[in-house]
Amino acid sequence: MKKIISILFPFLFACNPSEGVKKEHVQQDQDSTEIVIPVTETILDDPHQAIDQKIYPNGIEIVWFQKGKGAKITLGDVVDIDYKVRLRDSTIVDGNYLAKLKSIPFAVGYHMQTPGWDLAFQELSIGDFVRIKIPSKLGRGKKGFEDVIPANADNYLTVRVLKKRIPSLSSGGTHMYLVHSDTFQGKRFNEKNFLLMHLLASTQKNRYFTNSYEKNKPFGVQWKDKYMNEGLRKSLKNRKKGDHLLLIVAPQDAYGAKGLGQLVGPNETIFYDIQVLEVI
């Protein structure tokens, strides 16, 4: 199984565990100094008139096609986005269309993507439609990513910020966003049974300190397990097979002032991306 390249990975895994991120090539004018987006059926690919542009000291460039009337995006917000990522030659390397989804939720500030994403999104507002140039140093850098993203490649992100998500559960220091729930009416997780899940976990300082997808080894947990902090218990209670949820758990519901060894520092907030595989 390929390593994670994008926020799309859990969605692709849910559809087909053996299928990774694909890439699609479209033509570019060889004399152009800017990325050329061809006209297709999707709004992200249509030509648009720029109404504003900013270049930041860190190398990020943002071109606005539409300025939204919603609130400014801040650290910890979860927003629904419609997006595609291209290389300079217009090769598409990422996008929600790969999973046949109209949008994908993105949690700002917790390494769901490269550092450039987290920085750029904090310059946007709900309703913005933009193209963002993410320099390689804030993307995949010198390493690139396998045969998908070359070394030292800038990324060009075309994105519509559709809305800010409201938590499905908000309790104390825990905010849970239910991304998907199957109609399957199976056993629900509680104090007496066992839950099997795929899990990604990050803090602002430690990207994916837990990643069960990497070696395809799901986690099995019981209610009273030491790893199960209060935020996980609140969010996983009554969850069932097929549920996909995002969590942002503040220190008081996570590991508090003690942290969790070298994984979670004192008073750190934790982001989780969880796919429930089975409840037994």
Language-model-detected regions and their locations in the chain:
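Sec-dependent N-terminal signal peptides
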Residues: 4-13
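Cross-family detector of peptidyl-prolyl cis-trans isomerase
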Residues: 15-280
